Design a protein with these regions (language model features):
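N-terminal leader/propeptide and maturation segments of large enzyme subunits in energy/redox metabolism
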Residues: 1-35
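Conserved catalytic cores of very large enzyme subunits
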Residues: 1-4, 33-168
Length: 168
């Protein structure tokens, strides 16, 4: 069992490093502003998901890699992002306080994540595709909720997720 776990960890690392390598290659011919973005993407892809994310950008990339890997491994359906606002909020809060992100840049990152999520698809029958509005994988995100004692758990990121979903 442990050998298989180490094989998977190594495969995840290889998968992410391929994206880092591609970003560095693209940076060589990019204009300065885009080059800086691509080099930051390479830095992030060299780090996550096998090292802890420290920023919202790193956390989003980590979540995306894991989502892709789950799709590759299980040919999955209904691989929800879970209680996204709850587990991502510490990164959002820290980045807003540090000035690394604004609400608008967070919404932009989230919108891009949802658009990428919608690119994962499977070939289905025409009837199935029509009934699922062309996206039959049901990859959902959960925001807000209640605690056992009926207290709301809606937080600022819950609203930013709603804003981003409205743009997709």
């Amino acid at each position: 069992f442990y050998d298989s776990v180490f094989i998977v960890i190594d495969a995840v690392k290889t998968y992410a490093k391929r994206y880092a390598k591609l970003a560095r290659e693209l940076a060589k011919t990019a204009k300065p502003e885009r080059q800086a973005e691509l080099l930051d993407i390479a830095r992030i892809c060299d780090k996550v998901p096998y090292e802890p994310a420290k920023t919202f950008a790193e956390a989003v990339q980590s979540v995306w890699f894991i989502q892709c890997i789950l799709q590759i491994e299980s040919n999955g359906h209904s691989l929800s992002y879970g209680r996204f606002d709850q587990y991502m909020y510490p990164y959002v809060k820290a980045d807003l306080e540090a000035g690394r992100e604004t609400e608008d840049t967070i919404v932009e990152r989230l919108t891009n994540l949802w658009i990428k999520t919608l690119t994962i698809n499977k070939v289905r029958s025409q009837a199935r595709t029509c009934s699922a509005a062309g996206s039959p994988l049901y990859q959902n995100v959960t925001i807000g909720s209640q605690t056992r004692d009926k207290k709301g758990t809606v937080i600022p990121l819950s609203y930013l997720v709603l804003r981003s979903v409205a743009q997709t």
